[in-house]
Every structure is written in C-alpha cells, then in structure tokens.
C-alpha cells in the first residue's frame, strides 16, 4: 500500500492561513487593515495596510495661509484635537520670533492636558473593551462628554476647535469656565480610582495583557517610538520635561514609567498620566484665577484686533481685513517644533519661503512609527492577542494616514 504522505506534492502540504483583520473590524480602531499569516492560531506575520484615510493634508496646507492651516491639525488625531494645533502654532511662532503671554501659555497647557485626558480615557476604556471588559467605556465616555463641553465653551466646537492660533489662543476663558474645570478635577480623580479598582488588578485583564507585546527599551528607540510606548519600556522621556515648551518648566508633575514594556505596563502608565494631567490642570486653574493679562501677542500684524477697536480705529479695520484675506507673512526659514501629544511626540517641520503660505509642512505622527512595529510586536503571539497589542499602541488613523 502506498503511503499518502509520500504521494503528496510539496504544494499540497500544510500551508499557513492568511486572513484579513479589518478594515471594518471593531477592534481595528479606525480603518486599519492587517493581513495576518497564521500557523494554527499563532501569528507568523502581520502586514499593516494603511492609507484608507489619506486626505493629502500636508499638500492641502501648502495652499492655505498660516491661519487657515490650523483646522487641518484638529482632524489628525481627532481624539485630542488641540494638542496637534499646538505643535503647528509653536513652529509658526518660532519662525515669527514671537512670545506668547503667560496667560495664553497657561490656557494652552490647560487645554493640552484636557486633550491628554480625552485621548487616554478613550484608549484605556476601549482597550479594556477589546479584551472583554464592557463597563469602562460607559464610564469613560461620560467623563469625555464633560471635557468636550469644556472644549465647546472655549471654542464653540466639541472637537474641531481651531482654538490655538499662532500668537496665542483665539479668546480668553470666562472665569466661570475656569472655575468649572477646577471643580471637575477632584471627582474625576475619584472616577479614576473606581476604574482602577475595576480593571487594574482584574485577573482576566492581567492574563490578557501581562507579557503580551513586550518591547525592550533598545527596541523601542530603534523603532522610533515615543510617548507612552517609550515610557512603558522604562525611559522617563517626556518632551514636557526634556525640552520644556510654554510654561511646563514652572509646573510640578511626575513622569510615570513602566518596568516590562508590555501591554499592561502601557495601560498603567496611561492611568497614572491621567492623574498627573489632572495635577497640572489644578495648577493652571489656580494661576488663571489669580493672574489676568492678554491671551495672545499684541502684534496686530499677526493677531486680529478686538471687535471694539475695529469700531473705533480705521487702522484696526485694515489689519483685520488684511489678516483674514492675505494673512501674515512668515520670514523665510525652516523649523521643527514638537509637543508631547497623548500618543507620543507629535512634530511639525515647517518650511517658509517668506510668503503668507507654508512652502512645506511635514507632520511627524507618533502613531505611524508605532504601527510599523505591529509585525515585530505580534509575532509568536495568539490571534486574540493582536487586538490587545493594537489597543495598547493607541493608534488613530487621522494622523497615521494624514
């Protein structure tokens, strides 16, 4: 009798199985398509396919004035819109050589930290949902709603605020709003404790996240990781402390780091970062209630005049008209400005040719560097761990595809 195994041609032998994960998968966090090669249930290879949300943002910015370019940045990482505007404004201000007044800096820092809470709340709670916990997102979204109302009261919009402008912020915050943000902080810390009690020591959650997607510090740096991905692996690298911008150097906060660089450590770092952000917000609120002053530079060639001035002064009217039609001219040169966005180092490389529009605006999205390591992080893990690793990377496709 002939042995069937001998008769089988090489092509008929057992092949690895290929499946598509996404782009409509609920755990894909947007329009990610992963082509997975599986050996049984073990992941052999991960191939991310991106570009499904590509809108040509960098090219569109080249045809807009510096002021018109600001709203494009809200639409990159749409979980924390103002943090992106911040990097662009810092880059433009470096080229213009202008200083933002202290009150403007405090408002920017306050809203950047609100953005960090918005982003981390979304990530931590949906990450818990990806591995099977259904309660956290319901709690998290309730808090995000309160924070979005603070966005709305400052700028008129819940998400795409366009509130940070080159030179400062669009307008001052009403005292009642600052007081309400202060009143939000302590109950929010109580909610974080509840969330901690529900998820952090949960046996099933730990089984799904401990020793999954481990990345050593050397690997993290070699892949170009930043933000939580580096801090989770044990490096206390935070641009707010390492290269302070605005008034971060005057504020008191700690930088949490992980030990093992796995999904669980990254989750714990994000939880602690929310506490530190709340600490920063309290300090900003305290100073905003004490100190008055302008919220943007007084140079009317860059920042539009107040409405009252326009009714009295012809010159103010001319400034307003010129700013909103032609825009301001930025001296020729190139500059790189980066902020510690919730996802990592968000950088803008801005090249000016001396006109009213950017010659080139290169956006450095942190999620792009993190997503490229999916193959490295998932290889050898089970299929179910892919969504855990992806959730711990905290990826948003607005910024990855741009």
Curated annotation (Swiss-Prot):
Q: What SUPFAM superfamilies does the database record attribute to this sequence?
A: HydB/Nqo4-like (SSF56762)
Q: Which Pfam families match?
A: Complex1_49kDa
Primary enzyme class:
translocase
Q: Which reaction does it catalyse?
A: a quinone + NADH + 5 H(+)(in) = a quinol + NAD(+) + 4 H(+)(out)
Keyword terms: Cell inner membrane, Cell membrane, Membrane, NAD, Quinone, Translocase, Transport, Ubiquinone
EC number(s) given by UniProt: 7.1.1.-
Listed under subunit, the entry gives: NDH-1 is composed of 14 different subunits. Subunits NuoB, C, D, E, F, and G constitute the peripheral sector of the complex.
In Swiss-Prot or TrEMBL terms, this protein is called NADH-quinone oxidoreductase subunit D
Q: What is the lineage of its organism?
A: Bacteria, Pseudomonadati, Pseudomonadota, Alphaproteobacteria, Hyphomicrobiales
């Amino acid at each position: 009798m002939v042995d069937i195994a001998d008769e089988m041609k090489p092509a008929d032998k057992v092949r690895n199985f290929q499946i598509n994960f996404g782009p409509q998968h609920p755990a894909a966090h947007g329009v990610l398509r992963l082509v997975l090669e599986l050996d049984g249930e073990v992941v052999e290879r991960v191939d991310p396919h991106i570009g499904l949300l590509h809108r040509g943002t960098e090219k569109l910015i080249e045809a807009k004035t510096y002021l018109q370019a600001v709203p494009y940045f809200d639409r990159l990482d749409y979980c924390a819109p103002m943090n992106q505007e911040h990097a662009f404004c810092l880059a433009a201000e470096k080229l213009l050589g202008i200083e933002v007044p202290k009150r403007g800096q405090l408002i920017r820092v306050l809203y950047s930290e609100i953005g960090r809470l918005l982003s981390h709340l979304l990530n931590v709670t949906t990450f818990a949902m990806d591995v099977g916990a259904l309660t956290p997102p319901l709690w998290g979204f309730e808090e995000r709603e309160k924070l979005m109302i603070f966005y709305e009261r400052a700028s008129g919009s819940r998400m795409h605020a366009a509130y940070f402008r080159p030179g400062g912020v669009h307008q001052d915050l009403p005292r009642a709003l600052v007081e309400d943000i202060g009143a939000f902080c302590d109950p929010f810390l109580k909610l974080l404790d509840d969330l901690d009690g529900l998820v952090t020591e949960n046996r099933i959650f730990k089984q799904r996240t401990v020793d999954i997607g481990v990345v050593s510090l050397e690997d993290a740096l070699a892949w170009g990781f930043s933000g939580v991905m580096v801090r989770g692996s044990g490096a206390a690298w935070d641009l707010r402390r390492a290269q302070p911008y605005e008034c971060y150097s005057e504020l008191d906060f700690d930088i949490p780091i992980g030990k093992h660089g796995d999904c669980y450590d990254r989750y714990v770092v994000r939880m602690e970062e929310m506490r530190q952000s709340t600490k920063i917000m309290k300090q900003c609120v305290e100073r905003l209630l004490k100190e008055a002053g302008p919220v943007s530079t007084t140079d009317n060639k860059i920042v539009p005049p107040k409405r009252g001035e326009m009714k009295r002064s012809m010159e103010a009217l001319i400034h307003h008209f010129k700013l909103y039609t032609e825009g301001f001219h930025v001296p020729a040169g190139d500059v790189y400005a980066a902020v510690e966005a919730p996802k990592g180092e968000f950088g803008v490389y801005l090249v000016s040719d001396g006109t009213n529009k950017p010659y080139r605006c290169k956006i450095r999205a942190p999620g792009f560097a993190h997503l490229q390591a999916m193959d490295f992080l998932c290889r050898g893990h089970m299929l179910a761990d892919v969504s855990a690793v992806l959730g711990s990377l905290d990826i948003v496709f607005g910024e990855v595809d741009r």
